[in-house]
Amino acid sequence: MYVVNRKGEEEPVSFDQILSRITKLSYGLHPLVDPARVTQAVINGLYSGIKTSELDELASQTCAYMAATHNDFSKLAARISTSNLHKNTSSDIGDVASQLYNFKDNQGCPAPLISKPVYDFIMENRERINSKIDFSKDFEYDYFAFKTLERSYLLKIDNKVVERPQHLLMRVSCGIHCGDIEAALETYELLSQKYFTHATPTLFNSGTPRPQMSSCFLLRIPEDSINGIFDTLTKCANISKTAGGLGVAVSNIRGTGSYIRGTNGRSNGLIPMLRVYNDTARYIDQGGGKRKGAIAIYLEPWHVDVVEFIEIRKNHGKEEMRCRDLFPALWVPDLFMERVEKDQDWTLMCPDECRGLQDVWGDDFKKLYEEYEKQGRGRKTMKAQKLWFLILQAQIETGTPFICYKDAANSKSNQKNLGTIVSSNLCTEIIEYTSTDEVAVCNLASIGLPKFVDKNNKTFDFDKLKEVTKVITRNLNKLIDVGYYSLKECKKSNLRHRPLGIGIQGLADCFMMLRMPYESEGAKKLNKQIFEVIYYAALDASCELAEKYGPYETYSGSPASKGILQFDMWGVTPDSGLCDWDLLKDRISKHGIRNSLLISPMPTASTSQILGNNESFEPFTSNIYHRRVLSGEFFVVNPHLLNDLLELGLWDDRLKQNIIANNGSIQNILTIPEDIRELYKTVWEIKQKTVIDMAADRGPYVCQSQSLNIHMENANFAKLSSMHFYGWKKGLKTGIYYLRTQSATRPIQFTVDQQLLKSETKEKDSLETNKRQALEPEAQKLIACPLRPTNMKDDEECMMCSG
């Protein structure tokens, strides 16, 4: 048997050579990672004539599939792939920049992949940049992170990767701080150490000829006309092609059967229009297949087409009424929630016949809405609860619609001086003002919280958190000035209001590293402290920028200009002692702030996997599972749990099979100590009241909003209704992003070794009984809610499809 080396020469397969290569890459890994075992597994998969680069890929995949034994196999898999990448790429940033800048397309025309200013900046500082890049950090990613980077983030020429991960981070840093080498190197150092990451569009596009680095865009259709609808559609397409996610407000579009003055005809309503937007979302992908375009559509629940709207993602019904590539979202006024709670009537209206409802909130909305009701302008009157239960049914089946609370969003916004905010964004964490000539924009970054934990002393470094947050604030503010805008309306909005979106990832990891169960008082306290410090540091940096460059254009009249910060709007007084709020308020009163908005904990699906953290502020969904993304499917084990079980001498194949059989839960495995079981509860075992409480606790320091998912086993109307009302009464701006559900009935698990589990069947049955008894009163623990549907049993099974 032979292999073909990179020179095209045939060589006999050598066990010792493969073993030597794998051994060199196994430094610092757990003893369970046995290079000889890995080598033998690789040898077993060889065929004669395999190329050495293919041999590396085979070795890497072999290790990846062994990651269920220990996560260090995933690290070894990544190291093999990284080593292979390093063999095929230059280490010199100047060489890489030259390849990218001098690229020509298939017709021989110049098609540079990085901009001339960035290329010139890199070449001017080539020697210094090369001296600062640490390629050993490329070997710190796990396999899942590396394959994600390789598939979507590292720049390619003719489908061949030419960047290394450290080159990517340096390109991003130079793209942001072109002309300022000190700031670029500061950013690179923090990015490479995984203290934070910029959002996916920034990683995609920073340093390129068209550096569209913003993540979120909010639009309203300017007028209910062919021109208004299709001009907005064109804007959506142009934004989506450069990796932007969209939120579009459509509450001003006339409903089904409405009179059309220009043609003397009748409108087909909202859904046929949305199908055109749906097809656009399907057609546009974000930069050559990196990820699909995505659009959330926001509608207020008084709209006459609301019933059809909330069902657009259902799997059944008339196909012409379905838009499964859009994400329906409701922009809910308090008046609707009040009428649902009191079981009162609710009137559906057409915005063409009842004008202005979208543009008012609070008492003004209530006054106008009730005036239209008195005048008999409504199209249809129904029980508010009937519509409510249709919403709940759609959520149970599809995970949507998202729900944001219009009055909370407007009353607690630092942009309230601009006008009424009419929607959120794709992921419900951005809440910004839009108008007919402004498309709201936001640039995002997320902080890798586990980097601030000292595991030995069980402490959290708040001083370092302040330092990193201030760097992020300066970076995001710089993005506003150096970014590319595909629309003049985007540029106008971003330059006038200068909003930022700083989020987090790995909060659940922090709790585990500090030995704090997610529901513990310690976790609740740390959650508040982290967000207070982030908000303080971001405001501090923004004030420093305002001192240098002046406040943002529309600062005058904003709550901040009157000394009112986010926690003041919640009626909360910070009491951690970690921040000098009086001093900061005094400075803001003198200099203002450079950015209208600052904090918005967003989903971090891709970037958290690159950094190796759990998503956002979410609890772990499982302790052992497969993860599927564009780059493939990978086995993931909770690394914190695995380390604890190894230290206790409990980790073996039988325990692994037992955890798989329990769907990633360890609550029913009595061989694991109780304190460990408490620490590693999954999101399905954590009271969602706690999740909502923690969202409300951080709310006073979140000046935009937060992507709040709700997870529920055996979802029914009573439990779901209780959670919605609990969150609304806690003052949340975002009531729910996705509803994630699962049934108590599990599919047959063909991958589980049943023989290993037979001896534990009795123990499991007993514990399952105890678990059911403990979970049954969950709804009562949340909030006493009198609502009951008349057409569906409370215990009807969940029918959720993918969200």
Curated annotation (Swiss-Prot):
Active site: 425 (proton acceptor), 427 (cysteine radical intermediate), 429 (proton acceptor)
Disulfide bridge positions per record: 216-442
Any one cellular-component term (Gene Ontology): ribonucleoside-diphosphate reductase complex
Key words, A-Z: Allosteric enzyme, ATP-binding, Deoxyribonucleotide synthesis, Disulfide bond, Nucleotide-binding, Oxidoreductase
GO molecular function: ATP binding; ribonucleoside-diphosphate reductase activity, thioredoxin disulfide as acceptor
Catalytic activity: a 2'-deoxyribonucleoside 5'-diphosphate + [thioredoxin]-disulfide + H2O = a ribonucleoside 5'-diphosphate + [thioredoxin]-dithiol
Identification of the protein by name: Ribonucleoside-diphosphate reductase large chain
Organism: Cryptosporidium parvum
